[in-house]
A protein has these predicted regions:
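Short, positively charged
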Residues: 1-12
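Signal-transmission linkers at sensory-effector interfaces
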Residues: 13-62
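Helix-loop-beta substructure at the N-terminus of cytosolic sensory domains
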Residues: 65-106
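Allosteric regulatory "coupling" segments in signal-transduction proteins
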Residues: 97-128
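Signal-transducing coupling segments at domain and membrane junctions
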Residues: 126-150
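A short, aliphatic-rich beta-strand micro-motif
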Residues: 149-157
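Short hydrophobic/glycine-rich mini-motifs in sensory/regulatory modules
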Residues: 156-166, 171
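Regulatory loop-to-helix N-cap segments in sensory/regulatory domains
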Residues: 169-185, 195-202
Length: 202
């Protein structure tokens, strides 16, 4: 039977015909090559995810150690600067947070009505936006920012209705659609709980 199997010829697009054994060996080699490529990709992803995990862990520890809201916002901004960004900002919807007296954090307030056209235009049904903002849009979310080339913007909270977190870069091509948003997503979920230490939810 073994000799009979070896004698079987299989059509081959380049070599005309090959033996069944050769054909199976070639398939096995190809399969191993695909597995090796997949394994390399998985390793790359694991290393990238580990990097994201440690960045997030460092940020969480730093923000948890803050002595005030201003200290927390400064630590958040510094963390972004350490990553080579221009900065990081938070804007909160006043119908979800008590931003007036006595806490007096009105500078964080973002009118939902003012933000809505930008949200529809840039985010649509998505929770994150990566790319440029035009002048009027920047005035809505980052009125004091200068030389912003591109932003990574994410809606805060699991229901995406508490406010916005923004990372800014002076480089217009730094943030682009199609880039990964895993770290952004985790930060947007983590921040509201940390903010509740200093600001009461409505």
């Amino acid at each position: 039977k073994a000799r009979a199997v070896e004698a079987i010829r299989v059509p081959h697009p380049v070599r005309g015909t090959v033996s069944l054994v050769e054909w199976h060996m070639a398939r096995a080699r190809n399969h191993i090559h695909v597995l090796e490529e997949n394994m390399a990709l998985l390793m790359e992803q694991a290393i990238a995810n580990e990097g994201l995990f440690y960045r997030l862990l460092y940020l969480q520890r730093s923000l948890t150690a803050a002595s005030s809201l201003d200290d927390m916002l400064m630590r958040f901004h510094r963390w972004a600067r350490d990553l080579g960004l221009a900065g990081a900002s938070l804007r909160l919807f006043p119908d979800r947070w008590r931003l007036g007296a006595p806490s007096n954090h009105t500078h964080l307030a973002l009118s939902r009505q003012s933000f809505e056209p930008l949200r529809i235009q840039r985010l649509g049904q998505e929770q994150h936006y990566l790319g440029p903002l035009n002048g009027p849009e920047l005035l809505v979310v980052l009125p004091e920012a200068k030389a912003v080339g591109s932003v990574a913007m994410s809606m805060l909270g699991s229901d995406a209705d508490l406010g916005v977190v923004l990372f800014t870069s002076r480089d217009a091509s730094h943030y682009q659609q199609g880039q990964g948003t895993q770290l952004l997503h985790e930060i947007a979920l983590m921040l509201p709980e940390l903010l509740e230490r200093w600001i009461e939810r409505v």
